[in-house]
From Swiss-Prot:
It holds the Pfam family Peptidase_M20. The gene is pepT. It comes from the Bacteria. This is Peptidase T. The active site is at D80, E175.
Length: 408
C-alpha cells in the first residue's frame, strides 16, 4: 500500500499545467494522459465504475458496506496545476524535521524561503516539509488533494471494519483556468453532496467563496505620424493608463484581505493603435459584486464621454458565485466536516476562500460542495510547500467523514 507522500511525489512528476490560451477540452493533453493513469490506479486499488471521459473527468465509486441508506458523498480534487509558473521537471526536496530557519531552495540562484516573508511555515517546525528547488511550483495545488483522496479510499478498502456509505471520487481538469466544472456531469457522478480537497493549511474548512467575474477592456486608438499628430492621434496606451487609474487604487489583491473585494489587473497589451486590459473582479457580497461590475463599466463610459466617441469597450462575464448561498441550505455538510476534524485532533479553521474552487460552480449545479484543506501553502509559485503530516491528516479526515456519515 502506497502512502500519501509516495503518491504525491509520483503525481507531481507529471506536468499537467492548464492553459488560459487553449480552447481544447481539457486545455492541455497532459491532463488527459494523467487522468488515464489515475483511472488505472483507481481500478487497481479496487474502486468500481471507474470512468475517464474524453474531456478528462475521472469518476469512480467505493460501494457502501452498510445496510442502511445514507447520503452518497463525493470527494473531488483537480488534476491541473496553475499556468502562473512552470510545472515542468518539478524537483521536490523533503526538509526533514524543519528547524525553524530560512530554507535555501536554490543556492545558485539565491532563492530562499524566508520566515519573515512566509511566517506560517514556523507552525510546522519539527515536521517534514516538501519544498521546491526554486525553479517551479510544487503542485500541491491540487495533487496533494488527489493523493489524499486515493490514499483514503485504499485505506477504507483495506479496512472493511470501518463502516461507510457509497463514496464517489472525482478528479477534474482545468480548475486553475476556471473551467473545472464546465463538463462535470453531476447526475453521472451520483453524489448527494461532496467535498473538494483544494484548500490550504491544515484545519481549513471553507464554505464561502468570492463572487467572481472577468472583464476585458478593449481600447481603440488612432495612430498618426507623431510629427503631425496634434488633435488627431488617440494614444491607446495613455487611454489604458487613464482607465487603470480611474479604478480605486487600494481595492487590489495586494491591499485587501478577509472579506474585502478587489479589481485585479491581470494583463496589459498596448500600443498606440489598440490596447487590451484583462481584469478579474471579486467580492463576497453579491450586492457589492454587482456594484463592482457596474463601476468598471462606468469607467469606460466616462472615458468615452471625455473623448466624445466610443473608444472603450468593456465586456464583463460572470465566472462563479459565492457557494455560501447553497451550502447554507444543507449546513450539516459543514457540521460533519467540523466534527470529523475535531475527532482526529485537528482544530477547524472556518475561513472564506479568497478565490474559488470547483465546488463554487458545483454547488450551483445541485451538488453542495464545501472545501477542505489539502495542506499546502503559497500555491502557484516557487515558494509553495506542503507538510507531510498535513497530507496524512487530510487523508485521515476523508476516512473520518465517511465514517461519520455512516453513523448518522
Amino acid at each position: 500500500m502506497k502512502d500519501v507522500l509516495e503518491r504525491f511525489l509520483g503525481y507531481i512528476k507529471v506536468d499537467t499545467q492548464s492553459s488560459e490560451e487553449s480552447d481544447t477540452v481539457p486545455t492541455t493533453k497532459t491532463q488527459l494522459e494523467f487522468a488515464k493513469k489515475l483511472g488505472e490506479e483507481l481500478k487497481a486499488i479496487g474502486l468500481k465504475d471507474v470512468s475517464v471521459d474524453e474531456s478528462g473527468y475521472v469518476m469512480a465509486t467505493l460501494e457502501s458496506n452498510i445496510d442502511k441508506k445514507v447520503p452518497a458523498i463525493g470527494f473531488i480534487a483537480h488534476m491541473d496545476t496553475s499556468p502562473d509558473l512552470s510545472g515542468t521537471n518539478i524537483n521536490p526536496r523533503i526538509v526533514e524535521k524543519y528547524d525553524g530557519q530560512d530554507i535555501v531552495l536554490n543556492k545558485e540562484k539565491n532563492i530562499v524561503l524566508k520566515i519573515n516573508e512566509f511566517p506560517e511555515i514556523l507552525e510546522y517546525k519539527g515536521q517534514d516539509i516538501v519544498v521546491t528547488d526554486g525553479n517551479t511550483l510544487l503542485g500541491a495545488d491540487d495533487k496533494a488533494g488527489i493523493a489524499e483522496i486515493i490514499t483514503a479510499m485504499e485505506y477504507l478498502i483495506n479496512h472493511p471494519e470501518i463502516k461507510h456509505g457509497t463514496i464517489k471520487v472525482g478528479f477534474t481538469p482545468d480548475e486553475e483556468v476556471g473551467k473545472g466544472a464546465d463538463h462535470f456531469d453531476v447526475k453521472k457522478f451520483g453524489a448527494d453532496l461532496a467535498y473538494t480537497l483544494d484548500g490550504g493549511g491544515i484545519g481549513e474548512l471553507e464554505c464561502e467563496t468570492f463572487n467572481a467575474a472577468k472583464a476585458k477592456v478593449i481600447i481603440e486608438g488612432r495612430n498618426v505620424h507623431p510629427g503631425s499628430a496634434k488633435n488627431k492621434m488617440t494614444n491607446a496606451v495613455l487611454v489604458a493608463n487613464k482607465f487603470i487609474n480611474m479604478l480605486p487604487e487600494n481595492e487590489v489583491p495586494e491591499r485587501t484581505e478577509g472579506y474585502e473585494g478587489f479589481f485585479h489587473l491581470l494583463s496589459v497589451k498596448s500600443e498606440v493603435e489598440t490596447a487590451e486590459l484583462n481584469y478579474i473582479i471579486r467580492d463576497f457580497d453579491r450586492k457589492k459584486f454587482e456594484e463592482r461590475k457596474e463601476q468598471i463599466k462606468e469607467v469606460g463610459k466616462k472615458i468615452n464621454e471625455e473623448y466624445n466617441k466610443e473608444i472603450v469597450c468593456v465586456k464583463v462575464e460572470d465566472q462563479y458565485y459565492n457557494m455560501k448561498e447553497k451550502i447554507d441550505e444543507v449546513k450539516y455538510v459543514v457540521d460533519i466536516a467540523y466534527d470529523a476534524m475535531k475527532a482526529i485532533d485537528i482544530e477547524p479553521i472556518l475561513v472564506p476562500i479568497r478565490g474559488g474552487t470547483d465546488g463554487s460552480r458545483l454547488s450551483f449545479m445541485g451538488l453542495p460542495t464545501p472545501n477542505l484543506f489539502a495542506g499546502g501553502h503559497n500555491f502557484h509559485g516557487r515558494f509553495e510547500f506542503v507538510p507531510v503530516l498535513s497530507m496524512e491528516k487530510a487523508a485521515e479526515l476523508v476516512v473520518k467523514i465517511a465514517e461519520l456519515y455512516a453513523n448518522r
